[in-house]
Every structure is written in structure tokens, then in C-alpha cells.
Amino acid sequence: MTKGTQAFGKKHVKSHTLCKRCGKSSFHIQKKRCASCGYQDAKKRTYNWGAKSIRRRTTGTGRTRHLRDVNARFRNGFRGTTPKPRAQPTN
């Protein structure tokens, strides 16, 4: 048996699978931790040396459905869903 380059060709077992949080195939099956987002930890894994990675994943890069709704409500002064009752004309 050799311990060098030839032995690495025999590796065929998957060590990583899909992550529930980020969807990448970076969730380590034995460690139960995602190498990309750090899933199982409460906070998302980010490092400042990965500035490009932060730029790709940050708020505003996806649908931002909730934030668009918040912005629309902000422009209208956070009014409720029901319109204000019209003032009755006084006679």
C-alpha cells in the first residue's frame, strides 16, 4: 500500500452534501457543519478577507421581497392596510 498520490484516487465517499441554509454542497456530513455558511451555528460564517463572498451574499442581492415592502410602507408613512376614514361633511 502506498500513502501518496495513488491512494487519493481511491477516495469515492462523499464528505459534503447540500446545506439547508445556503444550498451549497458544503455541509460536512460527519462534522455536521457547513464549510460555506457555518450552518448549525447561530450566526452566518463571514470573514472580511472574503470581501467578494460577502458582496455576493449580502442583503439586496436576492429578491428582497420584505425590504421592498418595508420601503413602500416607509414612503407612505407606515399607514395601516385600511384607508383612513373620510371626513363626513358637516351640515
Swiss-Prot record:
Entry-linked SUPFAM superfamilies: Zn-binding ribosomal proteins (SSF57829)
A GO BP annotation: translation
UniProt remark on cofactor binding: Binds 1 zinc ion per subunit.
Xref: InterPro entries: Ribosomal_eL37, Ribosomal_eL37/eL43, Ribosomal_eL37_CS, Ribosomal_zn-bd
GO molecular function: RNA binding; rRNA binding; structural constituent of ribosome; zinc ion binding
GO CC, one annotated term: cytosolic large ribosomal subunit
Binding site for Zn(2+): 19, 22, 34, 37
UniProt key word Aminoacyl-tRNA synthetase: no
Keyword list, A-Z: Metal-binding, Ribonucleoprotein, Ribosomal protein, RNA-binding, rRNA-binding, Zinc, Zinc-finger
Chain intervals annotated as zinc finger (C4-type): 19-37
PANTHER family tied to this protein: 60S RIBOSOMAL PROTEIN L37, RIBOSOMAL PROTEIN L37
Family: Belongs to the eukaryotic ribosomal protein eL37 family.
Function of the protein: Binds to the 23S rRNA.
Annotated protein name in UniProt: Large ribosomal subunit protein eL37
Gene name of this polypeptide: rpl-37.2
